[in-house]
Each structure stands twice: as C-alpha cells, then as structure tokens.
Swiss-Prot record:
Pfam families: LpxK. It is an enzyme of class 2 (transferase). This is Tetraacyldisaccharide 4'-kinase. ATP binds at residues 54-61. It comes from the Bacteria. Keywords: ATP-binding, Kinase, Lipid A biosynthesis, Lipid biosynthesis, Lipid metabolism, Nucleotide-binding, Transferase. GO terms for molecular function: ATP binding; tetraacyldisaccharide 4'-kinase activity. One of its GO terms (biological process) is lipopolysaccharide core region biosynthetic process. The gene is lpxK.
Length: 325
C-alpha cells in the first residue's frame, strides 16, 4: 500500500497536477471498466455503506462509530466491516481482543470498541462470517468505490475545508470518483468539520439529505500543560484544528503518512521533540491504538460526532433502510 501525505497541488491546481492528468484519465477508465464487469455480492442483511469520493480523512470513521452507537441503543444486531488499511492481514477475520493494529489495521482496532468488526481482505470472504454472525445490519467502512459489494444505503462524508480539492481524479487530484455522481446517488451526505459556518455552493442542491456534523472532543485533558501533537491520519489539519478549538497549548506538531506504522526511531524522535518543549505527546485515537504499551506516556484526544439533524438521520436510516420494520 502506497502511503502519501496530501500534497498541496491536490487542493490547488499547478503544473504537477496537469502533468499527472493523463494518468488520472487512465484511472478513470480502469475504474469504469472494473465497475462494468463486476457482479456485486449481496449479503443477507441491510448494508449501510459509509464512504467518500476523495482520498484523505473526511470523518467517515466517526460516522461509522455514530451509527454503531445508534444501532446498539436500538438493540439492532450489527456488524462493522473495515478494509484493514495499513495492516499485514492475510485473510478476512473477526477482530478479537489481543489483535494489534499491525495485524488487522488501526481503524479495525479503534472500531472494535463499539461492536463486532470484520477486517476484510476480499469481499468474497465476508459471506461465511456474516452467515455465522447473523446481523440485521452491516456497516461497511470505505467500500463506496468497491463494485463487488451491493449496498442498500449509502452515506457520503465530505470535509468542509477541503471539499473536493482541485476536482481532479487520482493522482492529479484527490478524487476517487466524480463528486456529482457520488452525491446524486447518496442517501445521506455528512458535511464534516470542526468549525463550519455555511453550506458550500456545491452541496446546496442536496440540502434535503445533508447533515452538518462537527467533530468535538469527548474526554477531559489538562489545559495547563504543554503538548506536542503528532498524527498519521488522512486529514491531520482537522486534528490540529480540533486541538486549537479545545484551547490546548500546542507547542509543536509532526505529521506522518496515513495509517503509518511507527518505528522505534520515530518514537525516540517524538520524545526528544516533546522534551525540548517541556511538553507531553498527544495524538489521535487511531494512532494511539498502536501504542498500547505506552499508554501512560502518550495522551489520546478522543472525539465524537455532533450532528445538527438527528431526526433526519433516524428517518433515513430506520425508514428508508428498512431497519426495525
């Protein structure tokens, strides 16, 4: 798996973006061909897909957690399926206590706090485990562009700061798929940000299925200390903005690629940087699950999703998705 930081030309077009455009056209053709030839697997439960149309963090993991909490509160049997990015997974497996992020992925370990999680390598291997678990609902994390899995209900997550970047497909831009195509087909659209004031023009045609969401801290952290922040997630800027909005004294930060597997040398460097600033290391939950043996030395900022229209979510999920009917 290639791990990249979000380059500036993905947000604002420059000569590099235009030079890469021919490769983007090839990517578009291959994606179309793949979708045209695929025969989707239909699972024996309602499948709710949470995804995005661009590379990088858009808050979809927090949406998955929100849905998991919602279904659990309604006593609806559910299973979460994740792709196990950044792991050494060899076969599709149910995540158990004792699994590590390196074995089943950081997102899988994080999501396993909220329900049963299947770390999937191939779609075709999911069915036997679903037949064994017999859920009423399956939440699939980031399978939106996978044509081999049938979806009953789709939720698209959009980051309100980045939106759709420079509007080019990978690798010239951040897009996996044409935004209009994705948004037209979506059942719900989450506009996610730590600080949002208005709806972007691109999303106004979808106001009837748009939910504004904010990512807010959910744990108490001492605001009288200095912190050195680091992360290896798709959108580190949102993490740093959340820290600032929480009014923590951040004296420095370091960015790693998404789903980064930290080395001992990385930790030693981070400790050195924190010591220079008389600070404590602070990171995201997705990064924190990789440091279980260092729980007393690294602070984790837990966050949760706060949405403006829970009634719309309940109506769409429990009526259109035919849950509890």
């Amino acid at each position: 798996m290639i791990k990249l930081l979000y380059p500036q030309f993905w947000q604002e077009r420059n000569i590099i973006a235009y030079l890469l455009l021919p490769i983007s056209l090839i990517y578009q053709f291959l994606s179309y061909l793949r979708a045209s030839l695929a025969y989707p697997v239909i699972l024996p439960a309602q499948v709710i897909c949470v995804g995005n149309c661009s590379v990088g963090g858009t808050g979809k993991t927090q949406i998955v957690i929100y849905l998991a909490k919602l279904l659990k509160a309604k006593n609806v049997p559910f299973v979460i399926i994740t792709k196990a990015y950044g792991s050494h997974i060899k076969s599709t497996t149910i995540i158990q206590k004792g699994h590590t992020a390196l074995e089943v992925g950081d997102e899988g370990i994080m999501l396993a706090r909220y329900g049963t999680v299947i770390a999937a390598k191939y779609v075709k291997d999911i069915l036997p485990l679903i037949n064994e678990l017999k859920p009423d609902v399956i939440i699939v994390d980031d399978f939106l562009q996978n044509p081999y899995l049938h979806k009953d209900f789709t939720i698209v997550s959009v980051d309100s700061q980045r939106l759709f970047g420079n509007r080019f497909l990978i690798p010239a831009g951040p897009l996996r798929q044409n935004p209009k195509q994705v948004l037209d087909a979506a059942d719900l659209i989450f506009l996610v940000s730590s600080n949002q004031d208005q709806i972007p023009n691109e999303l106004t045609p979808y106001i009837d299925k748009l939910i504004n969401a904010q990512i807010v801290p959910s744990n108490n952290i001492d605001k009288n200390k200095n912190y050195f922040a680091f992360s290896g997630i798709g959108n580190p800027q949102r993490f740093f903005l959340t820290l600032e909005n929480y009014r923590l004294n951040i004296v420095g930060y370091k960015i790693f690629p998404d789903h980064y597997n930290y080395l001992q040398a990385d930790l030693e460097n981070l400790y050195s940087l924190a010591k220079e600033h008389n600070a404590i290391l602070i990171t995201t939950r997705k990064d924190y699950v990789k440091f279980n043996y260092l729980n007393d030395e690294i602070i984790c900022l837990d966050v949760e999703l706060s949405i403006n229209n829970p009634d719309l979510l309940n109506e769409k999920i429990f009526k259109k998705a035919k849950i509890l009917n």
